[in-house]
From Swiss-Prot:
Belongs to the U2 small nuclear ribonucleoprotein A family. SUPFAM superfamilies: L domain-like. One of its GO terms (molecular function) is U2 snRNA binding. LRR repeats lie at residues 41-62, 63-84, 87-108. It comes from Neurospora crassa (strain ATCC 24698 / 74-OR23-1A / CBS 708.71 / DSM 1257 / FGSC 987). The gene is lea-1. Associated with the spliceosome. The keyword Repeat applies. It comes from the Eukaryota. Keywords: Leucine-rich repeat, mRNA processing, mRNA splicing, Nucleus, Repeat, Spliceosome. It is found in: Nucleus. One of its GO terms (cellular component) is post-mRNA release spliceosomal complex. This is U2 small nuclear ribonucleoprotein A'. InterPro entries: Leu-rich_rpt (IPR001611), LRR_dom_sf (IPR032675), RU2A (IPR044640).
Amino acid sequence: MRLTADLINNSLSYLNPLKEREIDLRGHRIPAIENLGVAGPHDAIDFTDNDIQVLGNFPLSPRIRTLLLARNRIAQIQSTLPNATPNLKNLVLASNNIGELADLEVLGRFPRLTHLVLTDNPVTKKENYRYWVLWLCPQVRFLDYVKVKDAERQKAKELFGTADEPTELAKTIKGIKSKTFDVGASSANGAAGSGPSSKLSRLKLTEKEKKKLQDLIKKADSLEEIIRLEKALNEGRLPPGIIAEDDDAMEE
């Protein structure tokens, strides 16, 4: 189900236990974040139990303090998200698909992030995962529900150095990123490799979704249709008709 203006307007908005104004968008199988401009100002958004692949495409939202995104399919955090949500304090990304330590670099650009949850992501199995996150995010006080210790911060500095003078280990880690489509950087890449086919190779899709998208591109019979597909890919979302019909039938 797409995150339409109607879905947003019909969703429950309430004060949560932290006295934050929260909107409930749980469990709709939303494939991509869009149309949040119609939601109005909120302190917290609950996207738990959806199919979101890219965390991004937020309008400027300085009021947002909490994002709940457990049990999605997130493999990438858009590079522009810290600019859109500069006051984010609590981020829950448990049970997603983040794979490499370098994919977490963007988290270091949230100046007020204090509570971070990444449990049950493949990246948590990487060597030095916890130290890496604490090195990137010195302001984080609770990581995966465990309070950060000063000794851990010191160990992180020993392993990875400083931001200005990173160790060889830090440089090596920074060079290994998942092969996913970077929405935020797409406009800077110029014309080369910017067509739908190259975006398809970098957007993290299932095999069925890839085939459906390839079919849509082949069947596009107008410039307007091609532009529509290009726009959807640039925004990191699946064009209508990509979600496997078999999956919808199973739900019924």
